[in-house]
Regions:
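Histidine-acidic residue clusters that define the catalytic metal-binding segment
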Residues: 14-31, 167-206, 238-243, 272-274, ...
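An aromatic/glycine/proline-enriched structural segment found at the starts
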Residues: 10-20, 207-272, 431, 438-466
Length: 677
């Protein structure tokens, strides 16, 4: 007990211990050699596990893709799917048989295997690098997948926001700001892909990194054998105009009528290289501001206000122009307030010195990450690769912790004022203008000056301020709107003769083809079956009063509220029974004005010009919170004299959509007895 008392008297646990000197770091350098074609090879031997990893990086000068943006993505998807010497199926089957993997990215490639299979995998890897298989069928398939992915992302607020903010930051003609479109992808030909490969896939700017259970001698012998004949090409160097910051802080707004939350990006350009003296102060300043969970921005917006799941910042460092960006996603109701709070935190780090304790916590975080990374053999190679590609001092990582430890509170404030440009911030907000724009227009700078708002479409083109006021004739009622819709699709008499409708639709979910069969009757019975490869994987059944859903062998009965919601809409044409529906306003749907009809917890949107239903919004409550599901209808076609939509797009989560294409409608079919049990 005496010993414990003395020990307790010697340590003041209310004070953070004074940090000691930065630990001495010894970093083993990889063994290297270079082929005559310019390929630089790095080898890190590690014999703890019988496996090998290979990375190919082509460090080309910055270049754009001009009128064929997306060609590099198509090339990356095609490479590694067979070679000029081995067909696709044989190639992939052999890799799978060996328990290995080979993957390609944009001007990069990766492979991994057990060490005993490394010679064969390197042969297959090298063959794919030197002799890609440019098959028309594969080209068309990969291009189609890219187009489908692009279509699926067009209603994603996050995807559109990212596209616009990078395009505005760097410019649409700059490699970092360019983006593709469906029209551009459609115009890309196989010859463009071949030309891109011939121009930019060169060993002269390439690095090959081999890490694992190998010897330098064996790797050198194998690489010389497999890659010495990789043809060297002179890669063109192109100059681009240097992007500029906005002259004054401003809001750039992108209207997304389907947005349930706003995407915010507060951006300015920076010129920062990893070799600059400011590099270490800057990464620590950013970490304090928003580089982690305990960053100032996240503590404010998430922990204090509860407005978001996360609010962070990042800053780039490299040979080319970079940017600082603070980003978050918030509810529509707090969009303007979130913008103001981010601006406040940027000012705070510029004007209020951070505490020594906060700085030491950030240093400790970077130190811990750095030390843990060194435990991985691949880190040695990655550091050596970065020294080469970023023109760093050979001892950059040897001195990493020393440089980090030398950063002072004064350094943090100095670089915050230099790199977080309060007066030149581009604040890109992508959201639902009808709910957030008035609040954004009322924001002033922290000094009380007006904050200009500019408007852009989904492709970063400047447009006029959107309008949301849609005049509704005083004589228009819910009954008028519904009757117009009924007449537009076939007329009341024809619709009343429909006793049941069955539709069959196809869709793709996470790359897997699915089929959906849906049946509804005038007795408010409902059946949905989702099938994959002919097997039912999900099912919903409602007999008019009660029902259930089942998936993966698990059955869950509908509760009272779920049953009531299904009963309300489980009709071939619920509008025929919508006695209590009311006209609640008008909104733009896909840029066109539509009347909004409320029927219980469901809203129907009808195009003012065509009268057709273009959107259904169902609101449900779960765990005390309301959420809405939007389903868009389009491509109406005639079936047995009735106009029905052949395409529906359902927003299943923010940024996620399920698109179904109806292959057939069957009206008044004979139904199996007991199918709704």
């Amino acid at each position: 007990m005496l010993f414990i008392g003395i020990a307790g008297a010697q340590i003041d646990r209310s004070k953070q211990p004074t940090p000691g000197p930065a630990p001495s770091i010894e970093i083993t350098k990889p063994q290297t050699f270079e082929l005559k074609n310019g390929l630089k090879v790095m080898v890190v031997e590690n014999h703890k596990l019988p496996q090998v990893r290979v990375q190919l990086l082509i460090d080309n000068p910055m270049h754009g893709e001009a009128n064929v943006v997306g060609v590099s993505s198509i090339l990356a998807r095609m490479m590694g799917n067979g070679t000029a010497n081995i067909d696709k199926d044989s190639y992939n089957e052999e890799i799978d048989y060996l328990g290995a993997s080979i993957n390609f990215g944009n001007e990069s490639a990766f492979a991994s295997s057990l060490s005993k299979y490394f010679p064969r995998i390197l042969t297959l890897f090298a063959d794919a690098v030197k002799n890609p298989l440019f098959a028309e069928e594969e080209f068309n398939a990969q291009k189609s997948r890219l187009i489908e992915n692009l279509k699926a992302s067009e209603k994603s607020v996050a995807e559109v926001g990212s596209r616009v903010n990078t395009a505005l930051t760097y410019g649409k003609n700059h490699p970092k700001g360019e983006f593709t479109t469906e029209e551009v992808l459609e115009g890309i030909q196989l010859a463009n892909v071949k030309n891109y490969y011939d121009t930019f896939f060169s060993p002269s700017n390439a690095y090959l990194v081999v890490v694992g259970d190998v010897t330098f001698k064996d790797v050198k012998k194998l690489v010389k054998k497999e890659l010495s004949d990789w043809k060297k090409r002179d890669v063109p160097r192109v100059t681009f105009n240097t992007p500029k910051d906005v002259q004054y802080t401003q809001i750039n707004f992108v209207d997304m009528p389907n947005a349930v939350q706003s995407e915010i990006a507060v951006i300015n350009l920076v010129e920062l290289k990893m070799s600059d003296e400011d590099y270490f102060p800057v990464i620590l300043a950013n970490h304090i501001l928003g580089g982690g969970f305990n960053g100032m921005i996240n503590l404010n917006l998430r922990e204090d206000k509860g407005w978001t799941y996360g609010a962070y910042s990042g800053i780039g460092a490299g040979k080319e122009i970079q940017r600082f960006a603070a980003t978050t996603s918030v509810r529509n109701q707090v969009t303007d307030s979130a913008v103001v709070e981010i601006m406040k935190e940027i000012r705070n780090i510029r004007t209020v010195p951070v505490t020594e304790e906060r700085l030491e916590v950030s240093k400790a975080s970077y130190t811990g990450n750095f030390v843990r990374a060194l435990e991985r053999p691949s880190t040695i190679a990655q550091y050596a690769l970065r020294v080469e590609t970023q023109d760093l001092d050979p001892d950059f990582y040897v001195n990493y912790l020393k440089k980090l430890n030398e950063v002072t509170v004064e350094d943090i404030q100095r670089v915050a004022n230099k790199y977080f440009k309060e007066d030149n911030l581009r604040i890109v907000v992508t959201g639902k203008g009808s709910e957030v724009l008035e609040g954004l227009k009322s924001i002033t700078t922290l000094d009380g000056k007006p904050l200009p708002v500019k408007y852009y479409d989904r492709f970063a083109n400047e447009v006029e301020e959107p309008t949301y006021e849609i005049e509704i004739d005083a004589n228009i009622t819910a009954e008028n709107v519904i009757n117009t819709y009924i007449e537009a699709i076939g007329g009341k008499d024809k619709l009343q003769n429909v006793k049941n409708i069955t539709s069959e639709a196809s869709m793709t979910m996470q790359g897997m083809p699915l089929t959906m069969k849906t049946t509804v009757t005038t007795d408010r019975q409902y059946l949905l079956e989702v099938s994959m490869s002919g097997m039912v994987v999900q099912k919903q059944v409602f007999d008019g009063e009660k029902g259930y859903q089942s998936a993966q062998g698990q059955r869950l009965d509908f509760d009272e509220e779920q049953a009531a919601a299904i009963k309300q809409t489980a009709l071939p044409f619920p509008e025929l029974e919508a006695k209590n529906a009311t006209l609640v306003g008008a909104e733009f749907v896909n840029g066109k004005p539509a009347y909004v009809i409320q029927n219980g917890k469901t809203k129907w949107f009808y195009d003012q010009e065509t009268g057709l239903k273009v959107l259904e919004r169902i609101t449900q409550e779960m765990q005390g919170q309301e959420f809405s599901t939007n389903t868009y209808f389009s491509d109406y076609k005639e079936f047995e004299g009735i106009m029905l939509p052949t395409k529906s797009t359902t927003e299943i989560a923010p940024g996620m959509e399920a698109e179904a294409n109806v292959d057939s409608y069957m009206i008044n079919e004979s139904l199996d007895e007991g199918m709704f049990d």
